[in-house]
């Protein structure tokens, strides 16, 4: 380890490789541990070969002792005051035992986690408004150590950066495997001082997931699977290289767009999807509503649905995002969703965690 002294502080020689922290599944994180400093680089999932964000994670006890690289955002760990803009990351922090660090959230109306709702009602968590345009005054008042948010291609955080708020770019959703996305919990754990907890939890998730995959490889039948439904004239389906498509495969299903190479969402015409889905054995989708949907409602919504085999056979499964914990859990507990899909594909189990079979 090569260190040089500058005004009593140590600066780390970037030419030294340090100790690499291995990520087994996540493709967009590299981390190197130095003495009192962890250098984390998030690769840009939208532009190969470039860096989305670089962080210097410095333990609070070493504050002032290290001069980080000039292109790195400094995060003093463990984070004590965080604003979290997505429900999955709220849930993760609670699962890792760091829920008390959450001082603000965005899009409170879409959060179903009781811990967050109760604290928001008491005023110990502040609603910072819409995640796409958060209320700057509330953020300033909270004086967070960092703000967790999900980036998108071409997104800018200039307004937040101008007020000095360190941004944690939660690009985990761009991973192409479910375990790759879940493994980001190990990065987030570095920020909150819960590395051992995250390592233990991820080991459990990995074991559960891979055990189910090995079991499903023995299945001889592979039901054809259709996902989602028409929205404003467009049928949005997961790309064939998405984590959802791979989950379906790992559960033993044959996703109708498995041969597609996109990792993001496909924006398709209803007619095109129907032509591929006419023989689909299972149809599952997510919606927001106050009550369960019926087949009659679906038929009224779009008459083409009734030509799908799964519609005729009654193998339609709905997940109500308004009341389910689906969005809060599945990002970092893919083993839960894999178990659910396996039950749907093979056991016709009606006691499911997220989905319900449409009865009418």
Stretches with model-predicted labels:
Residues 1-4:
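Sec-dependent bacterial lipoprotein signal peptides
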Residues 89, 94, 105-115, 155-157, ...:
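Extracytoplasmic ligand-binding site segments that recognize negatively charged/polar headgroups
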Residues 179-204, 285-360:
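Structured C-terminal subdomain patch of bacterial secreted/periplasmic proteins
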Residues 126-152, 165, 270-284:
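Proline-aspartate-enriched helix->loop->beta-strand connector
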Residues 6-90, 197-226, 312, 325, ...:
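Bacterial Sec-exported substrate-binding components of ABC uptake systems
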Residues 46-140, 147-149:
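A short, structured surface patch at a secondary-structure boundary
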Residues 72, 77-81, 92, 124-130, ...:
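Second-shell loop/turn segments in exported
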Residues 207-296:
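Flexible, glycine-rich surface segments
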């Amino acid at each position: 380890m090569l260190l040089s002294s500058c005004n009593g502080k140590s600066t780390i020689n970037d030419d030294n490789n340090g100790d690499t922290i291995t990520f087994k599944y996540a493709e967009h994180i590299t981390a190197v541990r130095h003495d009192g400093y962890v250098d984390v680089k998030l690769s840009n999932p939208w532009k190969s070969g470039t860096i989305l964000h670089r962080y210097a994670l410095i333990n609070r006890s070493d504050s002032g002792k290290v001069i980080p690289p000039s292109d790195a955002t400094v995060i003093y760990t463990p984070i004590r005051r965080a604003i979290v803009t997505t429900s999955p990351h709220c849930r993760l922090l609670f699962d890792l035992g760091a829920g008390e660090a959450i001082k603000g959230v965005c899009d409170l109306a879409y959060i179903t986690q009781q811990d967050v709702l109760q604290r928001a009602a008491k005023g110990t968590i502040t609603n910072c408004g819409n995640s796409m345009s958060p209320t700057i005054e509330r953020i300033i008042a909270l004086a967070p150590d960092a703000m967790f948010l999900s980036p998108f291609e071409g997104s800018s955080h200039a307004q937040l950066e101008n007020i000095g708020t360190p941004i944690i770019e939660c690009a985990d959703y761009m991973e192409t495997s479910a375990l790759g996305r879940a493994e980001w919990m190990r990065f987030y754990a570095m920020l909150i001082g819960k590395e051992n907890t995250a390592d233990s939890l991820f080991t459990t998730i990995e074991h559960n997931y891979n055990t189910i995959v090995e079991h499903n490889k023995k299945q001889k039948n592979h039901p054809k699977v259709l996902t989602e439904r028409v929205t404003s004239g467009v049928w949005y389906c997961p790309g064939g290289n998405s984590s959802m498509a791979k989950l379906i495969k790992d559960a033993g299903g044959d996703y109708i767009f498995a041969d597609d190479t996109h990792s993001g969402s496909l924006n398709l015409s209803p007619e095109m999807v129907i032509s591929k889905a006419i023989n689909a054995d299972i149809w599952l989708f997510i919606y927001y509503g106050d009550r369960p949907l019926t087949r009659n409602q679906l038929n009224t919504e779009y008459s083409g649905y009734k030509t799908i085999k799964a519609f005729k056979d009654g193998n339609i499964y709905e997940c109500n995002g308004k009341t389910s914990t689906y969005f809060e859990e599945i990002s970092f507990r893919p083993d839960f969703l894999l178990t659910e899909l396996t039950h749907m594909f093979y056991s016709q189990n009606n006691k499911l965690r997220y989905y319900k079979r449409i009865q009418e």
